[in-house]
Swiss-Prot record:
Residues 189-523 form the Protein kinase domain. The active site is at 343 (proton acceptor). This is Uncharacterized aarF domain-containing protein kinase At1g71810, chloroplastic. ATP binds at residues 195-203, 218. Residues 1-39 form a transit peptide. Its EC number is 2.7.-.-. Gene3D superfamilies: Transferase(Phosphotransferase) domain 1 (1.10.510.10). The keyword Chloroplast applies. It comes from Arabidopsis thaliana (Mouse-ear cress).
């Protein structure tokens, strides 16, 4: 499950599964032998047990019976044991007061710089002593190198999979109790010491006796359920006090409940096994993604057996390609299926030795409802296109703003806050910076943080943090937006189609610049996960990809828009051609309306778009620059003059045979479709001229 550290020797279990297996088990079973051999690393009592072991008195009965988070029940349990609650409050208070006191003393004595590393290490140790709830919070923070100093980052990163393990004797006894068989009947080999330890449990490497498969055996840490139950109770009390004081707009109690619900699900290893099975089914087929197999027949609520994966932690290798794979997989999780990994810290990813991205630990998962997924994509779309009025409505849809919020004031505030952030283009937008900018307006307009939102945002923020550790200039939104653009252009959701229609037709005017941007971004998905460059010129590759996309079933909605606008433009082109002969010697008169001129400019942009996007961008500026000073007929002549010549259109013709058969068949239907639309427009124009 986790990388086997080189410093951790495997005595009874060879790391290489091709090596010969020792037929005699090298561990004692308490059922067959009263002697117990404990590894040197496990002889020391871990600090969580040492400092917070008094919580175990509850773990033996009430806490272990909590199969899921239930605040009223937890509240009732601890009301019967007020001394434990008071002792925990005193422990938390004195622990943090002690550490902050040392920091203040360092500042007073002007030795902060010298003691910085020492205090970082002390903080890590104190968090471990307090238990898994605080470790989980620190793990999230440790994945953001842009938010905390490097020394603290290094220390807190150790919490991801290098926490002091608990006794192997206790772990082996738990395995036997949970699975109902002696260890030597379950495994032919098992490591005498854990190969990794985390906040909720620790992992052993083993080989199944029946099948000989190499597996990871995760065993739950004693007392975690009691500690998390009590700590979430305390956090909820604090959230309630803040709410009563009116110091926060969000329902903090609901946020704590959402987080606690996820933690309790994470402590149920049977639930984790089912999550892993579902995750493997949905995302295991993605290129270069590996999801280990779960062995549910060997798993219980406290013991989980899964396929062993060898590799290195993602933040230990400089592999930006795998980050892109992770971004694509996260896009699928959040916006395609809505079932997402809500705890993506570096310890839960591996780079396998054959270059795949392995996902580990499926305890904390989230569900993103379809209407929220669509709302999130719409918000990204409107943000990138600076449509802040629509963005304010999106925030209502997402539950961030109450429906009664003053939309015009919110729109102005969002414009002030985000205009600067997106001025450098979508590929340079920092997700972390956006969150920081958004925070400036949250209190003023009574923004709320829905319970689901905190997990989604944390997932994206942590993913960007991992990427920044590999590439400091990496922007997760810039890498995700091409997939969002493609999804918006191809999705059958009525909500997204309506949003796209409104974006492209602003007050009835077709915004081809926005379509160009969406198409350009969506085509980046074709090469995002390609390690070897595609052979061919950049313009030819772009044209081929654009045509292939437009003439597929998925591109039907965009194709309809393009055909509609192309027919308008072709109609305007015909009128302009007729005018050039009719009025060539009779002055500046023209039958072209302003709508015809707009359609003609759009026609030029469409032709240029499919014959070379760089040309479109450079030449339209010339039309715009001189258009206002020219008569309609002169401008029409200039546009017609700048249209690509037949020779310049030859690259498109050479690409057509390379398109998929499906696209070629739809292309053959194009002339008939266009003729029908042109006849309809000509008939409608004739009727208007007769009766109007």
């Amino acid at each position: 499950m986790l990388r086997l550290p080189s410093s951790m020797p495997i005595v009874s279990f060879p790391a290489n599964p091709n090596l010969l297996i020792n037929p005699q088990p090298s561990w004692p079973s308490r059922r067959g032998n009263s002697a117990v051999v404990v590894s040197a690393a496990s002889r020391d009592v871990d600090s969580f047990t040492s400092k917070s072991g008094y919580l175990f008195s509850l773990s033996a009965d009430e806490a272990d019976s909590l199969s899921e988070y239930n605040f009223p029940r937890i509240d009732g349990m601890y009301k019967k044991k007020p001394l434990i609650l008071l002792r925990r409050l005193a422990q938390i208070g004195t622990t943090f007061s002690y550490w902050f006191g040392l920091r203040l003393a360092d500042e007073a004595l002007e030795r902060s710089d010298q003691m910085f590393k020492v205090r970082a290490a002390e903080l890590r140790k104190l968090l471990v002593e307090l238990g898994p709830a605080y470790v989980k919070i620190a793990q999230a923070v440790s994945s953001r190198p842009d938010l905390i100093p490097p020394i603290y980052l290094d220390e807190l990163s150790l919490l991801q999979d290098q926490i002091t393990p608990f006794s192997t004797e206790v772990a082996f006894n738990m395995i036997e109790d949970e699975l109902g068989l002696p260890i030597d009947e379950l495994f032919s080999e098992i490591s005498p010491e854990p190969v990794a330890a985390a906040s909720l449990g620790q992992v052993y490497q083993a080989r199944l006796r029946r099948s000989g498969k190499v597996v990871a055996v995760k065993v739950q840490r004693p007392g975690v359920r009691a500690a998390i139950a009590l700590d979430t109770l305390i956090l909820r009390y604090i959230a309630g006090l803040i709410k009563k004081a009116g110091r926060f707009n969000s329902d903090l109690e609901a946020v704590v409940d959402e987080w606690a619900t996820s933690l309790f699900k994470e402590m149920d290893y049977l639930n984790e096994a089912q999550n892993g099975i579902k995750f493997r089914k949905l995302y295991g087929g993605i290129k270069d993604v590996l999801v280990p197999k779960m062995y549910t027949e060997y798993s219980t609520s406290k013991v989980l057996v899964m396929e062993w994966v060898e590799g290195q932690k993602l933040n230990e290798v400089n592999d930006l390609y795998l980050v892109e794979v992770g971004v694509y997989c996260s896009f699928n999780q959040l916006l395609e299926y809505g079932f997402y990994h809500a705890d993506p810290h570096p310890g839960n990813f591996l780079r396998t030795y054959d270059g795949q991205l392995a996902y580990l630990d499926f305890g904390m998962m989230g569900d993103f409802r379809p209407e929220l997924r669509d709302g999130f994509m719409e918000a990204c779309l409107h943000l990138v296109n600076r449509d802040f009025k629509a963005l304010a409505k999106d925030f209502v849809t997402l539950g961030l703003l109450p429906p009664t919020a003053e939309k015009s004031a919110v729109t102005k505030a969002l414009t002030d806050v985000f205009q600067d952030a997106i001025s450098r283009g979508v590929r340079n937008i920092s997700f972390g910076d956006l969150l920081g900018d958004l925070g400036k307006t949250m209190y003023r307009f009574k923004f709320r943080i829905p319970p689901y939102f905190s997990l989604v945002i944390r997932s994206l923020a942590v993913l960007e943090g991992i990427a920044i550790g590999i590439s400091p200039n990496y922007k997760v939104l810039g890498s995700t937006y091409p997939w969002i653009a493609r999804k918006i252009l191809t999705d059958s959701s009525p909500q997204l189609k309506s949003s796209l229609q409104n974006l492209l037709y602003e007050e009835g005017v077709f915004r081809i610049d926005r379509l160009e941007s969406l198409l350009s971004e969506s085509l980046r998905t074709e090469t995002a996960l390609v390690q070897k460059p595609v052979v061919g010129t950049e313009s030819n590759i772009a044209m081929k990809q654009m045509l292939a996309f437009t003439f597929t079933e998925q591109g039907s909605f965009v194709r309809e828009i393009l055909l509609r606008e192309f027919a308008k433009g072709l109609d305007a082109y015909g009128l302009a051609t007729l005018d050039s002969f009719t009025f060539s010697g009779s002055g500046p008169s023209s039958s072209l309306t302003e709508e015809d001129m707009t359609n003609l400019r759009t026609f030029y942009r469409l032709i240029s778009l499919f014959s070379g996007m760089q040309k479109a961008k450079s030449q339209v500026k010339a039309v715009s620059k001189y258009g206002e000073a020219l008569t309609p007929l002169d401008e029409a002549s200039l546009v017609m003059y700048q249209l690509p010549s037949a020779q310049e259109m030859l690259p498109i013709l050479s690409i057509l045979p390379e398109l998929p058969q499906e696209s070629q068949q739809r292309l053959l239907q194009l002339p008939g479709d266009l003729v029908g639309r042109l006849v309809t427009r000509a008939f409608a124009r004739t009727i208007r001229r007769i009766f109007l």
